């Protein structure tokens, strides 16, 4: 049987605190690059991944975070470039919980090949629609 002293000394079970991300309440956030560099992924994978250290402003505070630079080939980012950040971690890079959105602010990049699949992830327009708009016939 449990005694009163044991009841008194027992710790109360508290509810688990949820971690807040830096983008809580915002779908995207504007920031600027502090450092652009490459890093290597965790154990079974092997590559050179491009990442950027970005500073964002939250209620008169400045917070630093690490964001993944998506896409193939070279990019035009350098320190003090303005970028748009969205959530989404990179699974094989520890500490990288955010991604940069292409074709916004200073992160303008043109790929060297026509992208036909997953265009919305990389902000690429549909080439078929471009061709149709160029050959529109006017009646009247």
UniProtKB/Swiss-Prot annotation:
One of its GO terms (cellular component) is mitochondrion. Signal peptide: none annotated. It comes from the Eukaryota. Gene3D superfamilies: Nucleic acid-binding proteins. It is found in: Mitochondrion. One of its GO terms (biological process) is translation. InterPro entries: NA-bd_OB-fold, Ribosomal_uS12, Ribosomal_uS12_bac. This is Small ribosomal subunit protein uS12m. It comes from Dictyostelium citrinum (Slime mold).
């Amino acid at each position: 049987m449990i005694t009163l002293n044991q009841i008194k000394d027992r710790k109360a079970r508290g509810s688990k605190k949820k971690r807040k991300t830096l983008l809580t309440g915002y779908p995207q956030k504007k920031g600027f690059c502090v450092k652009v560099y490459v890093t290597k992924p965790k154990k079974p994978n092997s590559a050179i991944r491009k990442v950027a250290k970005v500073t964002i402003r939250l209620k008169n505070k400045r917070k630093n975070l690490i964001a993944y630079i998506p896409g193939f080939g070279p990019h035009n980012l350098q320190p003090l470039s303005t970028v748009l950040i969205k959530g989404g971690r990179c699974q094989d890079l520890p500490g990288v919980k955010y991604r940069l959105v292409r074709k916004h602010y200073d992160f303008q990049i043109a790929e060297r090949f026509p992208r036909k699949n997953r265009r919305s992830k990389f902000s690429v327009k549909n080439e078929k629609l471009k061709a149709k708009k160029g050959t529109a016939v006017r009646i009247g």
